[in-house]
Structures are given as C-alpha cells and as structure tokens.
C-alpha cells in the first residue's frame, strides 16, 4: 500500500498489521495529513491545549539539587498538565482526529494508567465512548488511575493473558480495533506501533521541545547542552527531542529502565539490550527469547514496562544522534526521593529515571559547567502507594 508519509525511520517502522487494518491506517493517515494543513483544526487543537490542558507548561530551575556543582538544571513541567502527564497533549489531537473521521468510540491501551486517564478525559470532553485495555497486573498497581478513568465514564477492561502488563493490553486493543474500526478509533498511547502512529504522536507531542527551546532561550540566552527524557515506547522523549534533532550542539539522552539490573534480565531496555524484530505492527528493537518470542519486560514504573520502543528512537540510536542509557529501579527511587525532599516536587517513577541520569551526570563532573533540561513527563501521585510500600519495607518511612 502506498502511503502519503514515509512509514520508515531508516530501517525501522513500517505497517506490519493484518490486511483488515490497512484501510483504517490509511484513513487515519489521510485525516492526519489534511488536519495538519487545516487552520480550523489547528486552532481547535491549540485552544484545547491552552485553555483545557494548561499549556504552555513551566520550565522550572532547580534551586537546591545542583548545590555544590556547576550544573544548571531545569525541569520541563509536564507534570503540571491537566491529567497529570504529557499524555494529554497527543490524546486531544487524536480525539479531534477521531471526530474528524466520524468515529464515535475510542479504544486505548494503558500501562501506568496515565494514557488511560488522558484518553478518558478527552473522550468525556468530546463526547466519545471509551474503552481501555489494561494489564491485570497494572490494574492492581495503578488503582487511583483506574478509578479516575471510571469516574470519567470509561470502561476499563483488565487483560489477564501473557504477563498481564502493557504488551498484552496492546495486543487486545489491536484485536478489538480490527473488528470495530468502522466506528472506533484506536488511540495509541506512545510513539510506536504501525505507521502513521509514530509520526502522529511525535507531531502531537512536539510542543514539549518547542516550548522548552523558547523558554530556555528566554531564561539562559542559549540552548541546553543536553535534554534528557525517559523512554518506554518513547512519546515524551520524542516530543522533547523533535525540535532539537537538527541542533547538533544539543545532546539528546533517552533513559531506558534497567529494572533490577541489566545483568538480571529483568529490565525494559530493548534499545541497548534487545534485538530487532517485528512486533506491535512495526520493525524495531525488542526484548526476545532465543527462539524469537517476545520476552517480558520489567520496570518498577508501569509506564516504562514495555518490551519494545518507538522506531524513531531506534533510528536516532542507530545513527548516534541520540544517546540511550539505562537506570535501575533503585536509582530511580533515589531520584524520586531526592526531588521530593529538595525541590518539593513529586515526580512520576517514569520521569524519575530521566532525573536519576541527570543527577549522575551532575555528580560525575561537579566542576563542569553544563545546562541540562529533564523532561518531567508526569507527576507521582499515581506512584505514592508503590513507593510507600517499598520505603516502609526498607524502614525509610
């Protein structure tokens, strides 16, 4: 099938889906391309982002974290967005696209529950019926978000198959869509999956980097030395990176979850420790067994617990334009606690991975003058019970 936009990033990406879904993807691509040049659509999207979601979000300079070093550290505050995370940006765009295509239902998958909450709020706002697939394990560890989704009228469907986490929820959502795309739009939650989703999600998240550029120029008079973001599927990171890709002086650093440690095999870092394969409608690095089965990923943070990664990140990694590192559960928890204690901000566990790497960079070279920006992709309200139980067990509370 010929496409309007390039479905590949180097060798990564593509549309590896059953034939039955091709017309749905084609319709979505056509709607997206026409919406991008439709002033009325763009005005509506911008208005929702500003007056409903609360954009632009703040760029906050850390007052205390950098003490004793020559680092200047800023946080891009996506945690302040309505819904609690960056997810709200692109679901508003996709919900408007769904309406444009005449769809009446939304199907979504969610891990941490943030994309589920965002899908539920956008559906409630725009009068769409919403059903959300969520791994049974995630339903358990993210109960506040499950209740939020239900409050906003969404149906939450627990998925018990496989590892009962995000990858299984993705499979069920795609299965549902293949039988209902005439009336339903699949609101994919990250910059991964079959074309045109990685491109759509990036474009509906790129205001993160655009705002950051304008704000840092105003505050510091120059671009940052590096922007740092956590990577599960990779939507918050690609939203931050997109506007800086052609600025070679700006380092792009993506942080994958090392879980219990890469050497244990219990992690979610396919970019550096996976092999290329076909999964979830795309060609990308993924965690696989020796016989090519998708392996279970692991992270303390449900939103990073994904065995693959978006194709543009795979491409940026292969060309060396972006650097990808990994952070363990323990390092992320330490960063979580540090930000709470020293800056009075409770970050999501996902975002804590990015922060942990920034702290590592800072401590490794305290004498180095550097300007860093961390994308604080979400707030940590959803994680307080998980963190409470861990700290209590360690005697830290």
UniProtKB/Swiss-Prot annotation:
A GO molecular-function annotation: tryptophan synthase activity
Checking PROSITE patterns in the record gives: TRP_SYNTHASE_BETA
Residues annotated as carrying N6-(pyridoxal phosphate)lysine in the record are: 87
Q: Which reaction does it catalyse?
A: (1S,2R)-1-C-(indol-3-yl)glycerol 3-phosphate + L-serine = D-glyceraldehyde 3-phosphate + L-tryptophan + H2O
Q: What is this protein called?
A: Tryptophan synthase beta chain
What role does this protein play?
Answer: The beta subunit is responsible for the synthesis of L-tryptophan from indole and L-serine.
**Keyword Hydrolase set for record:** no
Q: Which GO terms describe its cellular component?
A: cytoplasm
Tell whether Amino-acid biosynthesis is among the UniProt keywords. Answer: yes
The gene from which this protein is expressed is trpB
Q: What do we know about how this protein assembles, alone or with others?
A: Tetramer of two alpha and two beta chains.
Q: List cofactor names only.
A: pyridoxal 5'-phosphate
Pathway this chain belongs to: Amino-acid biosynthesis; L-tryptophan biosynthesis; L-tryptophan from chorismate: step 5/5
| EC identifiers of the protein | 4.2.1.20
- Family, per the entry? Belongs to the TrpB family.
| Keywords, in A-Z order | Amino-acid biosynthesis, Aromatic amino acid biosynthesis, Lyase, Pyridoxal phosphate, Tryptophan biosynthesis
